[in-house]
Swiss-Prot record:
Pfam families: Ribosom_S12_S23. Residues 1-25, 110-129 are annotated as: Disordered. One of its GO terms (molecular function) is rRNA binding. Keywords: Methylation, Ribonucleoprotein, Ribosomal protein, RNA-binding, rRNA-binding, tRNA-binding. Residues 10-20 have a biased composition (Basic residues). One of its GO terms (cellular component) is small ribosomal subunit. This is Small ribosomal subunit protein uS12. Gene3D superfamilies: Nucleic acid-binding proteins. It comes from Rickettsia rickettsii (strain Sheila Smith). One of its GO terms (biological process) is translation. Part of the 30S ribosomal subunit. Contacts proteins S8 and S17. May interact with IF1 in the 30S initiation complex. The modification 3-methylthioaspartic acid is found at residue 89. It comes from the Bacteria. Belongs to the universal ribosomal protein uS12 family.
Length: 129
């Protein structure tokens, strides 16, 4: 426990919180260029081939980013937008690629949760009476 004099001289230091997505440098999104597209297997007890991409961000950092949704159009040298967000069963993957931004198309035929997958709203034909 500090003395009163120590508190007057130095004060109390507030603890700094560690960020979960340090490569974004406090930005909500960062653009980058896709270097490699690959599939990885998740931790136990899950089983799948999850799609991830290695991305070089605009601040020269290289990160692994998850590609959400079914089917994707991500290729090498594509410009991508990266947001934070961990994938629970993939160690070392702390970022997501935003679908429907830059060179990446949204998921086709998506009807629910469209904004998460960059899917456009289906046009409804209007009939006149």
């Amino acid at each position: 426990m500090p003395t009163y004099n120590q508190l007057v001289r130095f004060g109390r230091k507030s603890k700094t919180r560690k960020t979960k997505s340090p490569a974004l440098e406090s930005n909500p999104f960062k653009s980058g260029v896709c270097l490699v597209v690959k599939t990885v297997t998740p931790k136990k007890p899950n089983s799948a081939l999850r799609k991830i991409a290695t991305v070089r961000l605009s601040n020269k950092r290289t990160v692994n980013a998850y590609i959400p949704g079914e089917k994707h159009s991500v290729k090498e040298h594509d410009r991508v937008l990266v947001r934070g967000g961990q994938v629970p069963d993939l160690p070392g993957v702390k970022y997501h690629i935003v679908l429907g931004a830059y060179d990446i198309a949204g998921v086709k035929g998506r009807k629910q949760g469209r904004s998460r997958y960059g899917a456009p709203r289906k046009q409804v034909a209007v009939t006149k009476k």
